From Swiss-Prot:
Residues 64-139 are annotated as: Domain II. Residues 139 are annotated as: Flexible linker. Belongs to the RuvA family. This is Holliday junction branch migration complex subunit RuvA. The keyword DNA repair applies. It comes from Thermodesulfovibrio yellowstonii (strain ATCC 51303 / DSM 11347 / YP87). It is found in: Cytoplasm.
Length: 190
């Protein structure tokens, strides 16, 4: 129903923001780790998920549409409501959660408050099936860096492992390559 809201941020709290657009202030619940990227009195765009309940209407917001899509997949899982899904995304970012699922790391999922071993297993089971469609959304820059590391003689698995640990879309290619080479050179020396 609401794909995104673009407007001026009026209030920033750890778990919610108020964003004003068209003379209306929308209260939007966000993952706690997202609040550090949003500043008061700045224009921003938040991708949203509208949850209509019998007693309330809630808006959940995310900086990326892919994180919103993951939130919507999480709330489809039996026993995971919007509050638990936002709690999961407050603890782990999207890529970290994908890696946890990919490695079937029940221990890391169980560290999230409110998630026990059975719920963690259910999350792994449900999301593992859709992981290929949600897979890490690496862009052209990631592919170019991986290609450069392969051209320098590193093995694909080794280069990909290092790159997956340090890749950040906000860093420039040269910085990521330098950091990757530093780590890979350290492995060769062992």
């Amino acid at each position: 129903m609401l794909d995104f809201i673009k407007g001026k941020v009026i209030t920033v709290k750890p778990d919610k923001i108020v964003i004003q657009t068209g003379g209306i202030g929308y209260s939007v619940k966000i993952p706690i780790r997202v609040s550090r990227y949003i500043n008061r009195d700045e224009e921003t765009q938040i991708f949203t998920s509208l949850i209509v309940k019998e007693e309330s209407i809630e808006i959940y917001g995310f900086l990326e549409s892919s994180e919103r899509d993951l939130f919507e997949e999480l709330i489809k899982i039996a026993g995971i409501g919007p509050k638990m899904a936002i709690n999961i995304l407050s603890t782990y970012d999207r890529e970290t959660l994908y890696k946890i699922i990919d490695h079937e790391d029940i221990k890391s999922l169980s560290k999230i408050p409110g998630i026990g071993k059975k719920t963690a297993q259910r999350i792994l089971l449900e999301l593992r099936g859709i992981l290929p469609s949600l897979q890490y959304e690496k862009d052209q820059k990631y592919d170019d860096i991986l290609s450069a590391l392969l051209n320098l003689g590193y093995k694909r698995l080794e280069a990909k492992e290092v790159l997956d640990k340090i890749y950040n879309n906000e860093k420039d290619e040269a910085t990521i390559i330098r950091e990757s080479l530093s780590i890979l050179a350290g492995k060769d020396g062992k």
